Each structure stands twice: as C-alpha cells, then as structure tokens.
Amino acid sequence: MKRFEEFFVRDGRFVADGVPLEGMAGKYETPFYVYSATAIRTKYRLLKEHFPAFDICYSLKANPNPAVCGVLMRSGAGAEVSSPAELATALAAGFAPESIVYVAPAKTAADVEQVLRAGVHAIVADAASDLGLIEATARSLAVKPRVLVRINTKETQPEAKEVMVGGPSKFGFDEERVVADAAGPKLEHARIAGIQVYSASQVLNRAWLAEHIEYVLRLAQQLSRETGFRLETVDFGGGFGIPQHERDAELDVAGLAEAVARPLAEFRADLPECRLLFESGRYLVAEAGVFVTRVVRVKESRGRVFAICDGGMNAFARPVFMRIKHPARLLNRLDEHATAHVDVCGPICTPLDCIARDAHLPMPKAGDVVGLLSAGAYGYTMSLLDFMSRGRPLELIADTEELRRA
C-alpha cells in the first residue's frame, strides 16, 4: 500500500508523524486508532491542488473526531454534516457556518431549526415535504436560508458498493419529477439556490467520475433555466475512492481534473459566481488512520493460524460488516518476510469477530502489534463500542513529532 509506506514507514519501522510505535504502544493501551495529521493535510492539498475552483467540504460522518476536524478546518476545508450533533462538532472545531452544508434524508422540525439558527451555507432538501418544513421553519425564525435540491439522477450507475442514483432511492427528488415536485411548496422565505447530487461511495473509476461531473453541470444549468431559480451553488457530492485492497490502483485525481477541465471552464465562464462543492470524507482521512491492536494469543486449529487480539469488531467493526479486507501488518516486525496466512481475530465471543481473514504476515506471536491500514474513516464511530462491555479504543493523533489523545 503506497500511502502506508509514504505516511507511516521510516527505515523499516512504523512511525506516525515522527512518533515511533514504541512511543505509542508503550504509553497507551491497545487497541487504539492513530491518525497522521500530515497524511490528512497531504490528501486535502492533493484534492485542492487539482480542483482549485472547488470548496472541499469534509464529510464528518467519515470521522467526526474533533482533532481530525481541526486539521481539516485549519487546512481550509468546509464541512458537510448529517446530524445536529455533527453540526455542533463542526462549529466547535472552528468551521465557519458559511462553510457548512447540511445533508440528511430524515430531518425533523428540531433539526431544521438548529440548522437554520446556525446560519449554514445551505441545507439540502430530499423531497417536497422537506421544502415545506424548511419554509415553515424559516418563516418562524424570520430567516432566508439557501436550499439545495438533491437529485436522484438518471445517470448510469458506477461499479460501487453503495450507489444512490439511477434507481428507487430514499435520497433526493427523482430527476424526471424534480421540476414539478420542487414547484409544489410555495417558498417565500427559503429559496432554492442550487442542486446536490451524491451518486456513490468509494468510486475509483476516473472516467465515470468525469462523466458524473459533466452530467451534474448540465443538469444544474438545465434546471435553473426550467425553474427560474438563480444558480448559486452546485454540490457534486463525493465518492472519491481509495485503494482498499493490495491490488487496487489509486484514483487518478490529476487525470480526472484534466478530463473535466473544459466543461468546468465553460461553466465558470457562464456562471463565475456559482460556488462549486465537493464533499469528501473517506478520501481525505481513511489512509491517514491505522487501527492498532495487540496479539494476546496465537492458536493453530485444523490447519489455520489465529492471532487472537485485544481489539476486534467491538473496536473496528467495518471489516466484519462491510466485508472489506483491510491490509494488515505486524507493526513491530515490518522488516520481516510474510510466511504465514493468519486470521486476525478479536476478543468477542462470536465467530464473526475476525477483522482480517487470511492476512499474509510473519508468523505471529503473543505481544506482537497488528496494524490494520486505511482505518481513518468509518472506524471508531461505526463500531460496536459497547458490545460485551470491552471498553472503548483510544483515538490518538500524531502531528510533527507530537502524539496526543484526539
């Protein structure tokens, strides 16, 4: 994994932003997550360098840790939030309200009131009833919020596990009905100011992403003409993927930027004041995180080797429930050749608790420290943190040779 070597390996040793493994596993109890601030900044700058005309909104759902949010806020990112608690986290981390977009398919009156009181850049509507609720709340608060209409487009579906367009969906207005449906509620306080389209997650296909960006640009202009709303913001969603298996290639961000340069330039020439947004979570933070757990016992059973660790699906559930094989390393033995095929398991009393099946590792022994890579997104908060009362893993952030609890 190229990013792992780039961000975490120095002279054959596991090091996060200058802090060696011994300084982590010796000082803090395993299991824990460690995040590299340098890695987060690097991924943000890469995206911003190739798409300078876009505001990059960090999707807090990927990792709402305040320290992670702070790194991205100070780097210049905005925020995309999906709950009142995420909104509060973003504001506490220092994100300006004008840099925040609120995206959630089930909004209550209390949710909408909190969002409108905060004065975010935009709130996304998924249905005509959403528009009615936003309008009623705006009237009661005497505010004039900016609304983005989310659209379930008719575009071709990409090859991805989580696809949110092209078929029936709980998300957004169906493209073929959006003009009629959005015209239903009479809006006197809220105003439709643009569109949002989030098509899929974890997309590595550059050609499809280029087609998606062009599709959304055309659709935004078409709807603006047909409905008469002033196009102030176009939110393209996210979906930028990362390598999740050893065989995966990285997303060619430079090639993607080159592929959409002409349609973007034409759009900007027509609408130079229109704000363009990308939402990005996994792409920015996943590769910046490693889940660290310690081997308690090694067992061989009927031809299989099991490394039974102090952290499993209770602390890192994603590999189990999403069936994703996060690359594994013995962090204290990076310079040794892999000679064994190992099932890395946790302490939970279920056979489901295997966080890395058939991992190719040096033959493990008790006391070894296992790292699961690309664990910076959908790790801690997606896990079964109170299952079997095992205790919660720590979160640590390393930044320029300083390690602290995040």
Language model segments and positions:
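Conserved, mostly hydrophobic/aromatic
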Residues: 40, 61, 83, 115, ...
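A charged N-terminal "starter" segment
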Residues: 1-145, 187, 191, 225, ...
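Charged (often Lys/Glu-rich) extended helix/loop segments that serve as interaction or gating elements
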Residues: 259, 273-406
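Short, glycine-/Ser/Thr-/acidic-enriched flexible segments
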Residues: 39, 63, 86, 107, ...
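Glycine-rich, aromatic-flanked loop segments that form ligand/cofactor-binding clefts
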Residues: 144-156
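Active-site loop/helix belt of alpha/beta enzymes
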Residues: 2-3, 153-297, 388-390
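Structured core elements
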Residues: 78-80, 101, 124, 148-150, ...
